[in-house]
Amino acid sequence: MPSKVICFWVEPTELVQVTFRRYVTTGPVCNRIVTPYEGAQPTTWGYHDAEVPIEVRAKRPDDAGHDADDDERTDARWPTKCPCGYVFPPDVICRVHVRTLYRSPQRAGQWTLHDVPAGAMWDAPWLKGHDGAHPKPDNLYLVLRTPFFDWTIDGPSSNGNRAGWTRTGRPPLVTVNPSIGYGEPQKMHGWLRNGVLEVDLP
């Protein structure tokens, strides 16, 4: 069914969100249906996973996600079970995530790039030079969150075109050519015109 996703710009703040995450990729399969972010297409989660927010604080120069050390693992705030009810054994993976918070001039709220809604568009300078894409005149590397995946607008396309897409306009009111398709067989197809992602499949 055709739909439209209105794009909005997000930019990093000087704040980070710290979370505790436990997950296990072996053993019984987790078949819960999840919507990983606002506007996302629901999907089946294949493994047991739970994450809880711990704090929001100012950025530090040495911020980085990491496996929890022995002292951190004793914290009582770690999730004890997956939302499906599966109880984590004591030896599962424990990760401390430290993610930058983003905000938008067009929309209220703050998000990390882990949970930013569909329609969010941002500059990803850390991707420049990693895939051979041609730099754009505004020196931005645009990424757009769609209902299915993160579209690297300024990256190469999966069909082998290293130049990727062409775009005009000022973010988030950009027009991109050609269209975007996702999946094999195709799960999504659409056009980005003047800051609106017009999805014609599904």
Language-model features: locations:
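A short Gly-Trp-Pro
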Residues: 1-141, 149-202
